């Protein structure tokens, strides 16, 4: 092979490596997005299961006539529904996200934390009460 053919071959390989590097970067970005979505869906699933278990625990009351006719919820059923909603559930979800390695601060929300390093913005948010 002459020198020009070798140079062309090396240049071609360099272009292919550049394209592979670009594809690898795109794959990494897509993987990060899928991990974030998976985490969000897992938290939502857990939340819905908790709500379902709470609704199963509350004994179903017979439907009042007023509620059946007018679609108005009786006051004691309203209270039962309000008790099912957990206070601080959003805070618990943020803590869980942070423990799983994601930012919960408004600066980097949802992005993975590098090497599980602490973020001062996230910590200040989680320490507010």
Curated annotation (Swiss-Prot):
Query: How many cofactor units bind, and how?
Result: Binds 1 zinc ion per subunit.
Subcellular location per the Swiss-Prot or TrEMBL entry: Cytoplasm, Nucleoid
Pull one GO CC term from this UniProt entry. nucleoid
Q: Which UniProt keywords apply?
A: Cytoplasm, DNA replication, DNA replication inhibitor, Metal-binding, Zinc
**Binding residue positions for Zn(2+):** 103, 105, 119, 122
| Pfam families associated with the record | YabA (PF06156)
Q: Name one GO biological process term.
A: DNA replication
Superkingdom of origin: Bacteria
Identify the cofactor(s). Zn(2+)
Give the primary localization class.
cytoplasm
Q: Which NCBIfam families match?
A: PRK13169.1-4, PRK13169.1-5
Q: Which family does it belong to?
A: Belongs to the YabA family.
Oligomer and partners: Homotetramer. Interacts with both DnaA and DnaN, acting as a bridge between these two proteins.
Relate the protein's function as given in its record.
Answer: Involved in control of chromosome replication initiation. Inhibits the cooperative binding of DnaA to the oriC region, thus negatively regulating initiation of chromosome replication. Inhibits the ability of DnaA-ATP to form a helix on DNA; does not disassemble preformed DnaA-DNA helices. Decreases the residence time of DnaA on the chromosome at its binding sites (oriC, replication forks and promoter-binding sites). Tethers DnaA to the replication machinery via the DNA polymerase beta sliding clamp subunit (dnaN).
**What name has this protein been given in UniProt?**
Replication initiation control protein YabA
Q: Which organism is it from?
A: Listeria innocua serovar 6a (strain ATCC BAA-680 / CLIP 11262)
Q: What is the lineage of its organism?
A: Bacteria, Bacillati, Bacillota, Bacilli, Bacillales
Q: Which gene encodes it?
A: yabA
């Amino acid at each position: 092979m002459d020198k020009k053919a070798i140079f062309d071959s090396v240049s071609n390989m360099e272009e292919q490596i550049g394209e592979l590097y670009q594809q690898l970067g795109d794959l990494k970005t897509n993987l990060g997005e899928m991990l974030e979505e998976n985490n969000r869906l897992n938290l939502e699933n857990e939340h819905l299961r908790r709500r379902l278990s709470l609704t199963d625990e509350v004994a179903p009351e017979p439907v009042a006539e007023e509620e059946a006719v007018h679609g108005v919820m009786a006051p004691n059923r309203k209270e039962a529904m309000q008790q099912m909603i957990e206070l601080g559930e959003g805070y618990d979800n943020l803590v869980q996200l942070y423990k799983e390695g994601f930012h919960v601060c408004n600066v980097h929300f949802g992005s993975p934390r590098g090497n599980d390093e602490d973020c001062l913005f996230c910590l200040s948010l989680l320490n507010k009460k």
